[in-house]
Amino acid sequence: MEIFIENIQDKIEITDEILELMEKAIKMCLEHEKFEYPYEVSIILTDNEKIREINYEQRNIDKPTDVLSFPIVDMYDGVIKSSQGDFDLDEGRIILGDILISMEKAKEQSMEYGHSFERELIFLLTHGVFHLLGYDHDTPEREKKMFEKQEAILKSLNLERN
């Protein structure tokens, strides 16, 4: 498995402990789903301005958001629908996709919701990972299922709501 985390913002300090927590959370999401394939996932930590630009380019919404996911493999609720995904043939890995997280939004929302920055960051990260795995919140049932999965990971990491 390969996890790439790139920090392209300078507004919020990202410590080694935060990076380790992020990697652990990603691995836990995939283990929770019993994802058996070698994989690659890229995380980009950005600021409000950059995520606003990308949100506008990709979704025609001209405002910053907290997290954006760009899945590469066609999945639905954790199951690969098509084998036409992107594979790294040299390494034999499935490239799941990219997740962008606004560190400014994560900080703002942690203060708004009254919990730690780490909890909010990992909530957003797991949200993005489950989107890469084909989960969505487009119906009440699917939303409940997705958020239950996120909360299970947060609970395992002792990052429950206060």
From Swiss-Prot:
Localization per Swiss-Prot or TrEMBL: Cytoplasm
Any one GO molecular function term: RNA endonuclease activity
Co-factor requirement: Zn(2+)
GO cellular component terms, A-Z: cytoplasm
Record-listed E.C. numbers: 3.1.-.-
Enzyme class, first EC level, given as a word: hydrolase
Major localization listed first in the record, in broad terms: cytoplasm
Key words, A-Z: Cytoplasm, Endonuclease, Hydrolase, Metal-binding, Nuclease, Ribosome biogenesis, rRNA processing, Zinc
Binding site for Zn(2+): 127, 131, 137
InterPro entries: MetalPrtase_cat_dom_sf_prd, YbeY
Alphabetized SUPFAM superfamilies for the sequence: Metalloproteases ('zincins'), catalytic domain (SSF55486)
Biological process terms in GO annotation: rRNA processing
Cofactor binding note from Swiss-Prot or TrEMBL: Binds 1 zinc ion.
Family to which this protein belongs: Belongs to the endoribonuclease YbeY family.
Function according to Swiss-Prot or TrEMBL: Single strand-specific metallo-endoribonuclease involved in late-stage 70S ribosome quality control and in maturation of the 3' terminus of the 16S rRNA.
Name of the protein this chain belongs to: Endoribonuclease YbeY
Biological source species: Acetivibrio thermocellus (strain ATCC 27405 / DSM 1237 / JCM 9322 / NBRC 103400 / NCIMB 10682 / NRRL B-4536 / VPI 7372) (Clostridium thermocellum)
